[in-house]
Amino acid sequence: MKIDNKFPRENARDYALRILKNNILSLELKPGTVISENELATELGISRTPVREAIIELSKAYLIETYPQRGSFISLIDPKMVEEARFIRRITDTAVIELACDEIDEEGLAILEDNVTLQEFYLSKGMTDKIFDLDNQFHKSIYDIAKKDIVYEIHSTLMLHFDRVRNLSVATVKDFKVVADHRNMLEAIRKKDKKTAAELVNKHLNRYQIDEKEIRSQRPEYFKA
């Protein structure tokens, strides 16, 4: 498990929640992995109580499952939840990128350009683990530009399930066409071309639907039946 330092003024519960969630999404903690409050508390250097609170919070998001007498496990990936997350993203991302075409300014373009340029740099250097966070930041920036940041926060919990498949897609299928997708989306926004931008979003999201079949054939143990 990858463990980062606590942020200034970050309480123990939020620290445990952040570390656990990041490791689940990055697949450092693989689906089906048994987790122990005692071991996690020792690794994080905190007491069991904040770890327990973090586990409860992640259980509400269906990322951890706890069973009496059996313990807690990282949830297997649920294809139904992934598809529902993709459904919501298709609707909201399409509407939001069209709004971003109207709202875009030089500052917004600079933010998106810096992000995509970094993605392309890391891809060229084989540092693909760096792309995950930049991917999230890219899409969040589009919501911010469209002035729909609250919408992004509201659906972020369900998106966690989509994000696990997204990260597994890159790790398993080795398909980095998503970086080119981001470049093309940026250029459509720059041109204020709503039709092309919306089409690119749908193509981008459909890419993971195609990948899922390949992923499940290679990692069937990660998925619910």
Language-model segment annotations:
Residues 1-102, 213-225:
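Short linear motifs at protein or domain termini
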Residues 11, 109-110, 173-177:
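Short helix-capping and inter-helix turn/linker motifs at the boundaries of alpha-helical repeat units
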Residues 25, 138, 158, 175-178, ...:
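Anionic, Ser/Thr-rich low-complexity intrinsically disordered regions
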Residues 67-68, 169, 176:
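Small-residue-rich midsections of specific transmembrane alpha-helices
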Residues 85, 106-167, 180-188, 196-207:
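Conserved amphipathic alpha-helical segments that form helical-bundle/coiled-coil interaction surfaces
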Residues 101-102, 147, 171-172:
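Short helix-capping/hinge motifs at transmembrane helix termini and TM-loop junctions
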Residues 162-173, 209-216, 220:
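Short amphipathic alpha-helical interaction/hinge segments
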